[in-house]
Amino acid sequence: MPGINTDAFYELLRAGLWEKEARLSQYGEVDYEEIMSLAEEQSVLGVVTAGLEHVTDVKVPKEVLLQLIGSTLQIEQQNKDMNVFVAKLINLLRKEEVYALLVKGQGIAQCYEKPLWRACGDVDLFLSDDNYEKVKKFLAPLASSVEKEYVREKHLCKLPPKSEQFCHRKLNS
């Protein structure tokens, strides 16, 4: 059975996702360190930080707010860097006449109230069979490593920029 800190975490997560009022007094004395730990573990630290903006009934300790704001600013910068990387990658692929659809991660992040506050990860591209073959030829020489291909899921490569980005392809079979 989830504890009060888990319940408070979900309260803040809902508030951050849907910009709804959050009431934490119902959970009594919450452990903000545990809530932040859960948020980091689930890669939703920025969303939980956004949820804190909607707390109406208790005062969140200043040191907690400062720590979360600092972490969220780092997430925001990582997203800005990733968005620049994605734009450059898509432009490079277009020059090679490769057409891809950005899916999951960075694409879905744009649906969030604060897209830059969502933890960024890898780059997932949906490609036709022909475009996948073209992308393999283009990206493999640039990669720091190339992964084994599987019939249903293909993780093509790790590219060397700051954080490791991957090009994926999932088949519908």
Please state what every model-predicted region is.
Residues 16, 51, 138-141:
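Acidic/proline-rich low-complexity IDRs
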Residues 87-136, 140:
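Active-site nucleotide-donor binding segment shared across nucleotidyl transfer reactions
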Residues 58, 112-113, 158-159:
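Short Asp/Glu-rich motifs
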Residues 2-11, 18-104:
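Helical scaffold of the NTase/Pol beta-like nucleotidyltransferase catalytic core
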Residues 61, 65, 119, 164-166:
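Alpha-helix boundary/capping detector
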Residues 30, 107-109, 158-162:
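Short amphipathic alpha-helical surface micro-motifs
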Residues 78, 86, 140-173:
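Conserved catalytic core of two-metal-ion nucleotidyltransferases
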Residues 54, 108-109, 154:
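Positions that flank functional sites
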